[in-house]
Amino acid sequence: MSLVRSLALLALLAAPCPAGGLRIAVSFPAERSAAALDGRVLVILSKEAEGEPRFQVRDGPTGQQVFGVDVDGLAPGDEAVIDATTFGYPRASLADVPAGEYRVQALLHRYETFHRGDGHVVKMPMDRGEGQQWNRAPGNLLSTPRAVRVDPARDATLRVELDREIPPIPPPADTKYIKHVRIQSERLTAFWGRPMHLGAVVLLPEGFDEHPDARYPLVVNHGHFPATFGGFREEPPDPDLAPDDSARFRLEGYNRIQQQEAHDFYRRWTGPDFPRMVICKIQHANPFYDDSYAVNSENVGPYGDAIHHELIPALEERFRCLGEGWARFTYGGSTGGWEALAVQVHYPDMFNGCFAACPDPIDFRAYCLVDLYADENAYWLDGAWKRVARPGHRDWLGQVDSTLRDMNHLELVLGTKGRSGQQFDIWEAVYSPCGADGYPERIWDKRTGVIDRDVAAYWRENHDLVHIMRRDWATLGPKLAGKIHLYCGDMDNYYLNNAVYLAEEFLETTTAPHYAGVVEYGDRAEHCWNGAHELPNAISRLRYHTLYVDRMMARIAATAPADADLTSWRY
């Protein structure tokens, strides 16, 4: 349909608005759902000429305008209305959107009702195989993007119909080396009041079938939701692959580099000299995020115990692992970096070492650029005569393109009560006490940034990893000595290096025993730097699965008990 015809059609749909100003009314037909639906209606206005607006929402300078409103029991044909009072991002109000031509798309992120085991009843978006992504979740309703002319000053109603539904995602197939596992968790099912599952993507060693008597070390790779085992490619790189450049790494044909690295990993993994082991990536997407942070939480549930006492034993039995702490390791970056350290701290006897790269804040005195225990406001550094916005994201030269206020306001548009599925909301869901309404208590006011001291105190005692290690070193220290390995770039895009500095300060003071681990920094390295000083970040981030193997083998050699099986898996 041409732009002129699209605008003409929308002009016919426009109707006078008695309240004054522009309104955007979103509905769905009975063909899409005969039942009333709960969820979050999002409306995106995009200046981009191509692509779907739902994939153009972000907090940086290239992000497009989005508005959101909760709906409870929205019936077919009824309308969810966006008007000048609806909170939006980057412009806070529809009245502030410049008049002009846009492409509009609406989406309903569907919620279901959970009758939780703690007695609370909450409405949340259940993961449906996509890893808790509102713009890709199967079953979500959305409209076909179309051109509109927006004039906030005009008394009119722009009507948008949700005429499409995101289809189911087909499950990935198993291969000789990669297996996909799914179990129902008793603990999580009891907490959420409905069947809840944990999954894993398992990479088997070369010779697994040919050596039925072998028992293997288990290595847990933590990180964001893995649909399958990425970075492992049996086939050589595609010679006809069109090059896709990386703006972040300033590299041409980065997709070709990724394929080559994935194939190189396959060749090394199956080669004669690589230690045989099992690597698993955990699938623990949940109603809050694509990942649970692998610890027990008042809001997200007992994921720590479910993973370590249900999933890992099931994997070790099925895939013939050694099943002892000296033969388990964990590693990851960013979210996975925090998890690697957290599970080593909370389950110290279960792992023989953690390798935590660019971890999410491990000391809440440096929660990005916020000291949760001393600062009054997360968004602003206030002085007598001025206030300065706290940066949220920078590049390797320190140029800021987003503030903490930007990031959190976008989250508030995408979902109220911690339901955005984004970064600050999951931290809050994992670390906070449960509120009276069943949703996480806010660490700060999402609109203003004012910090809640009582919530911060709860965070400190339960999830501030450096504080917990300092508080409990007399009992934790003997179990952690030699196991902690931390890596971070000193120009981390999210300022995560600041918390690592504080962790290092504490760890270097430890005695009885000394922590005897590693803390290293990458010069001018951005997010995802993982300890490979000789490689650029663009390459080292593709080599996580092999980077720490030699150190793991050294730990096994130094710490395995006298009767340990050190031979069946070395073939």
Feature roles, as predicted:
Residues E31-A35, L94:
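Short secondary-structure boundary/capping segments within folded domains
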Residues S46-Y571:
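Non-catalytic cap/lid and distal C-terminal segments of serine-dependent acyl enzymes
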Residues S6-A15:
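Bacterial N-terminal signal peptides
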Residues L22, G39-V41, G51:
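Short beta-strand/loop motifs in extracellular/secreted proteins, especially
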Residues A34-K47:
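Short, ordered, surface-exposed loop/turn motifs in non-cytosolic proteins
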Residues A15-G21:
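Sec/Tat signal peptide C-region and signal peptidase I cleavage site
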